[in-house]
Each structure stands twice: as structure tokens, then as C-alpha cells.
Amino acid sequence: MTEATLLRPHAEQLFAAELAALRTADALPAPPNWLMSPHAVVRYLLGGETVEGVEITPKYIGPRRIIEVAVATLATDRALLLLGVPGTAKTWVSEHLAAAVTGDSTLLVQGTAGTVEEAVRYGWNYARLIAEGPSQQALVPSPIMTAMRDGKIARLEELTRIPSEVQDALITVLSEKTLPIPELGGEVQATQGFNVIATANDRDRGVNDLSSALRRRFNTVVLPLPASLDDEVEIVTRRVADISGSLQLPEVPTSAEEIRRVVTVFRELRSGLTADGRNKLKQPSGTLSTAEAISVVTQGIAMSAHFGDGVLRPADTAAGIVGAVVKDPVNDAVVWLEYLEAVVRERDGWADFYRASRDVLHS
């Protein structure tokens, strides 16, 4: 399968030219088993410059210091915990950090309520285990064990979704940098370059608090929501362009005005305050994250291209916005109707969006 046919290439595949250019131009010392210096990793994440004739695109739009602290943590023996509400680019930053540092973002454990200890330690090929007994050949390493052996970065997504007793299996790995294998009478010791990047949020339902012992093994970096409307509009615009290209959606003249309108609605309902700060608003139950705004605009482009006139209009995004806001058909519907009547209806230039949103509710 060629890269062009992949629905979502890994960061090290999609941005291979940028990574190669930064490695070529990098004259600063790199930590053991790193492919580039910490300074070059930060340049890759923040972008906005041209290196060796290659434009380095921004992967993260936000305070530079946050990325510097994250990269500096990875250069030590401390694991990194990226903490934030849903939609603050935790997974995105984690993937790009791993791609820049080791060239491999695929050593991934996806945390769920059903994650078992074998996912973070090791498992067994039970056919060989029964036939031969415990052996290295019967051992099935987890991504974390593989990262320890190879001196790479393991990614642990949604750490707080994992049951607490499974979380605590990480303590020995993070503190002693070893993974005991009592069945074989041995252990795996981490080689230089090994580290763990975990992501977590404590806002969603169904999360498990981290124990104090485990939390002490991490340096925590909090990723905030975009600081300004302009920053969030830029993030949405860039990601929509990337996703539309990978999905090969028909070209649609993407209206900057429509993207700004979607982001404005999300920011106002998320904060419970209108953009001018004059009116307080009821807040819906959903998170209304930047990631959801990206999804709404991408869906709008598909609607416009396939069922509209090829221009992104309020009618194309209204259904997606209503779907993102109204998670609870009773309480959230009241919040949305009040917002439409009190804010959208009275706002200059928003009459078409008001009509489209009302049509969705009554369709």
C-alpha cells in the first residue's frame, strides 16, 4: 500500500521531508538515541520557518514554552503526561514528539476501560506457551517493552481510562526503568532514549484518577484550549485543509467567514459568555472542543461538495453544529434554542446561519 492511499499516514511518513531537512540542518547535540536535538524538535512542532528549502509547517499553535517544557522532560528520565480537556491536541502533540525524537510514533497503547495488564507489560503466545513452556519465543512484548528494548518513546493514550490496578503496573517501568519477567527469571532493562508520553483528561465521564505514586513518576504539562479566536480559527483551517486532502474531498471554496462563525459558536457556548463579554450563556453538556469544530467544518465541506453548490455555506455546517451542541435532547436543546434567539438572531450578518439552524431543529 502506497502512502498516497493511506487514510491517515503516521506523522513520520506525512512529514518525512520536514524531519529530514531539520536533521540535516541540525548542528546541536542530541540526547542518546534521539534523531535530532531538542531545539530542532521544538522547531518541528512550532514550524513557521523554512529549513533546507523545506517549509516547516506548524503542528502546534500555542505557547512556545509548553512545547519546550515537554521536550526538555523527554530529555530527562522523567515520563511526560500531557493533560488537558478533550480537543486540546494531546494525541497530536504526542505523536509528533515521538516522530521527531525517534522517527517512530507507532509504539502505542490505547487506553480503554478494558485495557489489561498485558497491554502495558507483556503477553504470551498461548499455543507456544502450552507446547514449549515459558520462553522468549512465546513472549509477546507490549509496545512499552519494545520501546524499552529499542530506546524509543512509547505512547500511552487516555491513561485515565485504564483501570487503576493496570495503571499501577507502570510504576516499576517508570521508576526503575525495568520490566520484570518472573516466568523467565529475568527482566528487560530500558536502553538510553526510552521514555513514555501519556495523555489524559479528567473532565470526561468514566475516568479513573491516577494514584499519587503514579502521578509522581510523570512531569505534567497542561495543554490549554486555544487562547484566542484567531488562534483557534487558524488551527481549524489548517487541520481541515490537511484532512480534506487526505480524504480527497472535492475542492470547495472554504469560506473563512464560515469557519470563524463555527469557532465563535463553539467558544461562546464553551465559555458561557458571548465574544464581547456582555452576556452570560447557559453551557451545554458537551465539550465543544477544537477537534469537534474541525469535524463540523470537514463535514460541511463534504455536504457542500456533494449535495450543495460547491461553496461552504451556513446550511452545510448547521447540522454538524447542532449535532455537536445538542448531546442531551432535552437540556441541550433548550440551551441551543436560547442561544439562537438571544444571540444569533440579533447578530448582524448571521441571519442566514440563524435560518439554517432553525431549519435543522424543525426538520
Describe each PLM feature range.
Residues 64, 68, 142, 168, ...:
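Non-catalytic, well-ordered alpha-helical scaffold segments
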Residues 2-248:
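AAA+ P-loop NTPase catalytic core and its hallmark functional loops
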Residues 233, 240-314:
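Conserved AAA+ ATPase small/helical "lid" subdomain
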